[in-house]
From Swiss-Prot:
Glycans are attached at N140, N158, N399, N438, N464, N558, N595, N648, N690. Residues 23-746 are extracellular. It catalyses: L-tyrosyl-[protein] + ATP = O-phospho-L-tyrosyl-[protein] + ADP + H(+). The lineage of its organism: Eukaryota, Metazoa, Chordata, Craniata, Vertebrata. This is Angiopoietin-1 receptor. Angiopoietin binding leads to receptor dimerization and activation by autophosphorylation at Tyr-990 on the kinase activation loop.
Amino acid sequence: MDSLAGLVLCGVSLLLYGVVEGAMDLILINSLPLVSDAETSLTCIASGWHPHEPITIGRDFEALMNQHQDPLEVTQDVTREWAKKVVWKREKASKINGAYFCEGRVRGQAIRIRTMKMRQQASFLPATLTMTVDRGDNVNISFKKVLIKEEDAVIYKNGSFIHSVPRHEVPDILEVHLPHAQPQDAGVYSARYIGGNLFTSAFTRLIVRRCEAQKWGPDCSRPCTTCKNNGVCHEDTGECICPPGFMGRTCEKACEPHTFGRTCKERCSGPEGCKSYVFCLPDPYGCSCATGWRGLQCNEACPSGYYGPDCKLRCHCTNEEICDRFQGCLCSQGWQGLQCEKEGRPRMTPQIEDLPDHIEVNSGKFNPICKASGWPLPTSEEMTLVKPDGTVLQPNDFNYTDRFSVAIFTVNRVLPPDSGVWVCSVNTVAGMVEKPFNISVKVLPEPLHAPNVIDTGHNFAIINISSEPYFGDGPIKSKKLFYKPVNQAWKYIEVTNEIFTLNYLEPRTDYELCVQLARPGEGGEGHPGPVRRFTTASIGLPPPRGLSLLPKSQTALNLTWQPIFTNSEDEFYVEVERRSLQTTSDQQNIKVPGNLTSVLLSNLVPREQYTVRARVNTKAQGEWSEELRAWTLSDILPPQPENIKISNITDSTAMVSWTIVDGYSISSIIIRYKVQGKNEDQHIDVKIKNATVTQYQLKGLEPETTYHVDIFAENNIGSSNPAFSHELRTLPHSPASADLGGGKMLLIAILGSAGMTCITVLLAFLIMLQLKRANVQRRMAQAFQNREEPAVQFNSGTLALNRKAKNNPDPTIYPVLDWNDIKFQDVIGEGNFGQVLKARIKKDGLRMDAAIKRMKEYASKDDHRDFAGELEVLCKLGHHPNIINLLGACEHRGYLYLAIEYAPHGNLLDFLRKSRVLETDPAFAIANSTASTLSSQQLLHFAADVARGMDYLSQKQFIHRDLAARNILVGENYIAKIADFGLSRGQEVYVKKTMGRLPVRWMAIESLNYSVYTTNSDVWSYGVLLWEIVSLGGTPYCGMTCAELYEKLPQGYRLEKPLNCDDEVYDLMRQCWREKPYERPSFAQILVSLNRMLEERKTYVNTTLYEKFTYAGIDCSAEEAA
């Protein structure tokens, strides 16, 4: 089965290769391959094709490594539109020897043609420049001895020695015999005397087809078309590669003298036509002279009776017809065939008819038509359509008329990027023709805003339908209003007025509205615009309030609600609808007296999820509540947690992660670990009562110790059965923990003689602790998990964030700035508790600009701790080009002043918003047709800079926790640098315990719900930052409150795609916003994606000013609230 799959994949890749090669007619002309003192050249031609990527000429080091390394001077061939050229003058003849290639690309696939040049004064000369054989052929590669020397002869393959001939046995014709040639035998073979070098070597290239003679395909089982006039069957496509001077499906049609190319449109412009030109085509053809010429230099005319490339074809003309050395037999009227042996209607080169030069179409389905004449009439397989990107299409429908073949193609979705030159191509036995035509794809109009609901009743809605503004191309021909109750099918009505009343609606029902615009032309109806949701008024009672659904037992759920009070004198009751999500037919409706506030839903199935809703009915039915969901309790033990992984192991900590299966009423997770070799009763249990948590950091572990870790799931029945234990071994003791003596010595210096007494007491206490440690290990581990962080302490030159840990960390040493070396200038930033000032500082004897951060007088203790924490983070991070680096710090009168790099262009958010040139300088925007002073490349560079910096932070195991455009600074040369490390934490998982202002719009779901922060939550924030970059500083979730975000994000709602954003960039954002943290990409993966986008030079962020352009909204009050 695997081999069959591999065969299919091989076939697909080969088919794609053939399509690409068929879309580009690439030719390499090697003028005078035997180099003497005359000028010589290489010319690479993309005939009849306009490639998106430039064609190139280079040295082929794969074929020949030990050749000159000098770069080639590649220039445009002024005589042709799409051609490159390399010319060597006489004085550079010594640097020419070697192997070369010409390369073109279509849709990312490369087509490479190879050739060689060698000295005419070489000791040996090859019989031919290239030799093409089939797999299994017996091959003789021969070199003619030109110079006689008393030296051994040596033969190389691809620069590696393979054979030698003693000096007294060197024949006039030096041969290499290869019986039953295989593809691995292919390569460049060279011959010289042992005392020679590259300049005296002769080269020939052997090409071995992957298949046996007249076979092609992935498994070489399909028969080749018979290729005439020495054409070569391509082993991947079965098509004939025609030699220069012939064309058509079987290469039977001869071109006019001195012309070449797939459609014979190219011409040799010299006085003697194609003399001295060696034509090289894609493998497996190789190189040959043009038709009518032979010899290594292609400067010898064919003798009488011979024609074709290298004059290898012989005329056998019947009826005494003339043999032309360029075209072969010239048949009289009424005769045809290679030898004019067939009587009948002469073949006519195909012609493309009735194809306009320009076509305008709407985006969507497109059915272009190609019509061709000729004899014989082209078949369906002989007509193709080539898109601007090189994609080759086959006809979807085909028919014949009296004089024409008509091919109808289908493009399921044509888009504006498909605009450009398309090519209709016809290739028959009578020849080949191509006709380019231009297609302009118009963007279908789409409203930018949802229709506004002015008023509603229980059965109507008054709607403002405005088509302005809209995205896409006009003019607007018609408008349709689509409407439907939620979860039902759409209906529509055509409207002409902007204010429209929609009647016959259902009471108290959620409806959705949107508008569809249409422009002139077939398929001119655009995609419906944004959806507006509204609810019609109620004519019944509202649903019960305070509904709660909880499991009661394995077969029962308990539904409760608040007491119901109505103004109606009619009797009322509560109708409860219960449905199983696993068994669709299991549905029950229960009537409950109105004076009750609960109902027990019994006779249910264990471990099954149910959905419940309720309404209050009188004589009229009331409004249904929202659906509630709950599982019945499990009747079996829960399964063992799955995908258990242990990672990020240090000398005292390790991260444990897992996943659980839904439906087993799992209420908590138990992590049990113990030192290897200790008794079972000496284990430590950590119970996590929130079953949605899927990772936990073990702390307080012993260095260089092996632990056994077990994880259990617990539900109403009990704990899951034990599975195999996972082994964990901590790293050796880190140096940071071993250098505590320095901190104690500093304390001794400060406290003096009194400190000596404290040290003695402390040492005695530590000794006692060490003795008791084995007995109280469980209590110590539990205490470690619940430690809190005390106040910040700092002294000049050191920083200590003391924590109630087993071992206090060393004070962080920071570079000290002298207070007198700081000259303050302007305030450049200010917050509620801090201030940033521009200053000139003196550091290491040099004056430089810096940004100085300090806390205000009324800042809280937590704010001071976070500020000192930022200095600690910067010290530990070290230097990186994409973070704001520390210059130094200074303590003055009890306040800490932090000096960091000065970013002359400010923060990224303001920088992006200032680029909105349509708002700041409309005249400039209109004149330059741009909506921003920043290009797509610059915006992607900002994104890549931040990703690179965050990758560095994650490698250092730091979590930023406040990643947003406002906290990115733009430095010299417009390099983005990550700043504001006040909330950063140097650990894999951080649980926030203090209350404070939170950046809600940038926070991940797990951070909002559980206050848990990881590198994965930084990835979520990065996705929002990427959205800010693309939207040029828009406010995330503009128009939504924080409360709405708490509700909608868990339901799958995400930021919408900016209109100027490519699908690939938005897909990267969506990957960052995946609900499960472990499914989000790492910063290293994000950086790889962005670097690839930068290399492709594609416009991923469109800043072109199109009609009806609008920027993403900005809501400063919402940003402050976050």
